[in-house]
Amino acid sequence: MTAATAVSDTRVEELAALFVRFLETNTAPDGLFTDDVFLDLSLPQWRLQARGREEFVALRRRSHPCRGTVPRHRADPTPSGFVLEFEENWTDAQGTWYCRELMRADLRDGAIAEASVYCTGDWDPATRAAHAEKVRLLRP
């Protein structure tokens, strides 16, 4: 864990926007990650880790090879960084997929040094259709 330092709301919003761009393009913008960034990714029944910017990006590309969109996200500052809640949509040969995720990011020198990501798992088109048929959400 990194040492707690004050993080400005402006920097949190900048990093959240850079992270969303990363999710949508599978390319890490300059200034988003430290060179030795550590990722701890928890999936419904699996856990993966990566160290370093290149490994982080490679893990992302393996799990989400298609570019997508982030229709909604919210960032909240923490003493050591921020928490980002986000949703993703992407399309492949099977159709449009969906997932919801939560990331706790610790910063060092204004960049993400550690990230713990919790993912609902990827909902394929059939799961999305079944959910839409059986569940009425009060909020998107």
Regions inferred by a protein language model and the residue ranges of each:
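Generic detector of well-ordered alpha-helical segments enriched in charged/polar residues
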Residues: E13-V20, D30, V57, R128, ...
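Short acidic-aromatic low-complexity motifs
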Residues: T5-D35
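Generic detector of low-complexity/intrinsically disordered segments
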Residues: A17-V20, L41-L43, A105, D109, ...
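A beta-strand edge to alpha-helix "cap/lid" segment located at domain peripheries
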Residues: T2-V7, A58-P140
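Compositionally biased, low-structure terminal segments
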Residues: V20-L23, T34, V57, V83, ...
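A solvent-exposed, acidic/Ser-Thr-rich amphipathic alpha-helical stretch
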Residues: T27-P79
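Alpha-helical structural motif
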Residues: R11, L15, T25, G52-E55, ...
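Short, flexible active-site loop motifs that bind/organize anionic cofactors or intermediates
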Residues: T2, F19, W46
